[in-house]
A protein has these predicted regions:
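Charged, low-complexity cytosolic intrinsically disordered regulatory segments
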Residues: 41-116
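Short secondary-structure boundary segments
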Residues: 36-37, 119-121, 150
Length: 150
C-alpha cells in the first residue's frame, strides 16, 4: 500500500477515521493524504440572473463560503499536526471545494490512492435521505478499497 486518503469533515467519526488512516499509513509505510472538501456548488444560469436583484444575499453567501474555506484550511492543518504527532512524516494536506463525494473520488483517482478512509454518518437527516451520504457514494464509485469508521 503506497497512498491512503483520509477524508475529513471535523466530525467525531472523521477524527476516528483519521487516526485509523494514520495508524495504517505508519504500519505500511504509506503516504497519507488528508482531504477536507468545502461544500460548494456554482450558481445555475437562472440563479445568477436572479442574483442581480439580490446582490446583498449573494455577497453574504460568498462571505460564508470564504469563512468556511478558512475553517477548512485550519481543519486540514490541525489534522496534519495530529498525525505528525503520531510519528507520521509523509503527510499531505489538501482543502478543495465542490461536492464532497465527487471531490473525494477525484482526488483518489488523480493521486492513485490504494485506500480511502472516512467517517460514516447515519442517514438521519432529511438531506441524506434524498441525496445519499458522502461515504455511501464514495464506497460505491471508488476504484479502491474504502473503509468507513463509526
Amino acid at each position: 500500500m503506497r497512498k491512503i486518503l483520509a477524508a475529513i469533515d471535523g466530525s467525531e467519526h472523521a477524527w476516528k477515521a483519521l487516526d485509523l488512516a494514520a495508524d495504517m499509513a505508519k504500519q505500511h509505510g504509506a503516504q497519507l493524504i488528508v482531504l477536507h472538501v468545502v461544500p460548494f456548488e456554482p450558481l445555475s444560469e437562472a440563479l445568477r440572473e436572479f442574483a442581480v436583484a439580490e446582490h446583498l444575499r449573494v455577497e453574504e453567501e460568498l462571505a460564508r463560503f470564504r469563512y468556511a474555506r478558512t475553517l477548512g484550511d485550519h481543519l486540514t492543518r490541525s489534522a496534519e499536526a495530529r498525525v505528525r504527532d503520531k510519528g507520521l512524516t509523509d503527510v499531505v494536506g489538501r482543502t478543495t471545494e465542490g461536492k464532497p463525494a465527487d471531490q473525494v473520488l477525484e482526488v483518489a483517482r488523480s493521486e492513485g490512492v490504494d485506500m480511502i478512509v472516512m467517517g460514516s454518518r447515519g442517514l438521519s437527516d432529511a438531506r441524506a435521505l434524498f441525496l445519499g451520504s458522502v461515504s455511501h457514494k464514495v464506497a460505491n464509485h471508488a476504484g479502491c478499497t474504502c473503509v468507513t469508521v463509526k
